[in-house]
Each structure stands twice: as C-alpha cells, then as structure tokens.
Regions:
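N-terminal Sec/ER secretory leader and immediately downstream segment
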Residues: 1-36
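Solvent-exposed, acidic/flexible segments
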Residues: 9-12, 16, 43, 79-86, ...
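A eukaryote-biased sequence property
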Residues: 24-25, 72, 166
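Extended, well-ordered protein cores
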Residues: 40-41, 45-47, 56, 60-82, ...
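Short solvent-exposed coil/turn linkers within tandem alpha-helical repeat scaffolds
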Residues: 48-56, 96-107, 149-159
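Flexible, glycine-rich surface segments
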Residues: 68-131
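A cross-kingdom marker for long, charged
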Residues: 118-119, 131-194
C-alpha cells in the first residue's frame, strides 16, 4: 500500500484512513522523512494516557522528547531548527542531567546532549560550520548560536566548553580548534565525526 498520499496532499483511501485511526488509538502514527513513510510511536499518546503512572522527571523527559520530535532537528543532513532551539536543547539536557543524576534514561539524555553539542561545534554536512572554511568565516547559524549561548547562559557548563572554541575560531587558530575538538572527543563530550 502506498501511504505517500497522506503527505502529498492527495486524496487518501478509506483503507489508509482506517489504518491511521487504528494506529492512533494504539499510540502510533505515520510519519515521513525524505519521501519514506514509516510508523513511529506517538509520544503525545504516551504522555496523555500514562502520565499518572510516571515520575515527574519521566514526564519532563517525555515532554521534551515529544517537543523535539515535533520540531525535528535535521533533514537531508541539514539542521532544520533555529539556532536558539539548538542551544536551548543542549542546556535543557545539561540541566536535566544535573538535576536527575539517577534518572533511568540518563545515558539517553547524555547521548542527546552529546549529539547536539557535536553538531553545534562541528556542523553537519548541509549546515557546515563555516561559510568559507579557508577564511574560517562562520555560517550565520553558528555565529547566532554561539552569541545566544554566551549571552543567555553565561554560567552553563556548555558555555565554559564552547567559549575557548569560539574564541579560537574568531582568532583563526586552527591548531587550537583541532586540539579542543580532540580533547572534547577524548573526554566523551562530543562524538568523533572523522
């Protein structure tokens, strides 16, 4: 069955509508990415129907994941959220991890934070860090992200990590930049993209 009609604003058959309804009643939904349609968990269903059985940290975590799934992050190897959202996600995880050190999904939270920080520091294929790599000229996305982080969260752990990196880029110190990326990778703060 071809489910692409749902996302192409084409008429949808009764069979597909019924299938969609059945999925929704059971906590799932149809989604699509780069033309492929797939089934995924409907996190709003989980929060709505099971929240009375959850701890406050679990509710907060699931609401955050639901928000991130709704907003997305990247499509076709390009970041699709605004710089402020990107930074706010990193800080949300930083604070959540600090405030919930025994949370059952703590490693998952650390992994999300690590991924978001990795892409903030190194870019992603179709949202590169530099508009001109030779001149080390920031893409506007990252210039905006770093300025927002430094201004809004001056006391955050993430800001302490990012500040020397940001300064090294502004001063075009390639060796320092490479050393910091290596150091952060070894410490497990970011993923290795090489």
């Amino acid at each position: 069955t071809d489910y692409s009609a749902i996302y192409m604003n084409e008429p949808v058959s009764k069979k597909i509508k019924d299938f969609q309804t059945h999925l929704q009643k059971n906590g799932f939904k149809l989604s699509s990415s780069e033309g492929a349609v797939y089934i995924e968990q409907d996190r709003s269903f989980v929060v709505k129907n099971l929240s009375t059985m959850m701890s406050e940290p679990m509710k907060a975590y699931l609401l955050q994941i639901q928000k991130e799934n709704r907003e997305g992050f990247s499509e076709d190897a390009a970041i699709t959220i605004k710089p402020k959202q990107h930074v706010d996600r990193i800080i949300w995880y930083e604070n959540f991890i600090k405030n919930n050190p025994t949370f059952v999904l703590l490693e998952n939270c650390k992994s999300y934070k690590k991924a978001y920080l990795t892409y903030l520091l190194q870019g992603i294929d179709n949202t590169p860090l530099y508009s001109d790599a030779e001149q080390m000229t920031f893409e506007l996305y990252y210039a905006t992200s770093f300025k927002y982080l430094l201004k809004t969260y001056p006391e955050a752990e993430t800001t302490l990590l990012v500040t020397p990196y940001y300064e090294a880029i502004k001063q075009k110190q390639k060796a320092t930049i490479n050393d910091l990326i290596k150091k952060y990778t070894i410490k497990g703060l970011i993923f290795s993209l090489n």
